[in-house]
């Protein structure tokens, strides 16, 4: 695996391993770290917990996941999110089918988090952050769709601020 990418806003680190047309993403969530609810229009994901425990949101349901629970499939268009629930770091592994540009999405988002452009949940901190978010959402809307703010707000923001 290659080097790690750190997202301080969401308390996450990522490592990527290409797997043909697919991608393996290892994610480490700090205690309280979270990947906010979102969905992928064209990709399926297969999540498993390597170490620790997380609250996993799938559709409208939530459940606690541990290593012994095995792999959880997430079909395209299905809302999902993950929150670390223990008092120690959680390590997850996700197989993304197909990879498309998900690695770029996570790396770009983490870089913006390190620059302080947005707060948890993707809320821009200032006008520079709002412009960044509009361009980011426009660029990656085929990879990831955030469930907040609502899509009509995202579309309006893209229309007003994206270049």
What are these regions, as identified by a protein language model?
Residues 3-37, 43, 50:
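A short glycine-rich, His/Asp/Glu-containing loop-to-beta-strand
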Residues 109-163:
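Acidic/histidine-enriched, glycine/proline-rich intrinsically disordered or flexible terminal extensions
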Residues 42-54, 60:
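Glycine- and acidic-residue-biased ligand/ion/polar-headgroup-sensing regions
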Residues 30-32, 68-69, 77, 87:
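Tight coil/turn sites that cap or link beta-strands
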Residues 76-105:
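Ligand-binding loop in jelly-roll beta-barrel domains
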Residues 18-21, 46, 60-79:
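Short acidic-glycine-tyrosine-enriched beta hairpin
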Residues 30-33, 53, 98-102:
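Short, charged/polar surface micro-motifs in flexible loops or helix N-caps
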């Amino acid at each position: 695996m290659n080097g790690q990418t750190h997202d301080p806003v969401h308390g996450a680190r990522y490592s990527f391993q290409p797997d043909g047309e697919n991608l393996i993403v290892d994610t480490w969530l700090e205690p309280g770290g979270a990947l906010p609810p979102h969905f992928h229009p064209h990709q399926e994901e297969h999540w498993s917990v390597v170490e620790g425990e997380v609250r996993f949101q799938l559709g409208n349901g939530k459940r606690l996941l541990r290593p012994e629970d095995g792999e959880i499939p997430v079909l395209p268009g299905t809302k999902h999110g993950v929150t670390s629930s223990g008092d120690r770091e959680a390590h997850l592994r996700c197989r993304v089918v197909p990879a498309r540009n998900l690695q770029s999405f996570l790396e770009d988002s983490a870089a913006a988090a390190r620059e302080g452009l947005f707060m948890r949940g993707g809320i821009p901190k200032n006008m520079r952050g709002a412009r960044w978010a509009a361009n980011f959402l426009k660029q990656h809307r085929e990879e990831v769709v955030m469930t907040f703010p609502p899509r009509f707000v995202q579309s309006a923001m893209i229309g007003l601020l994206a270049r």
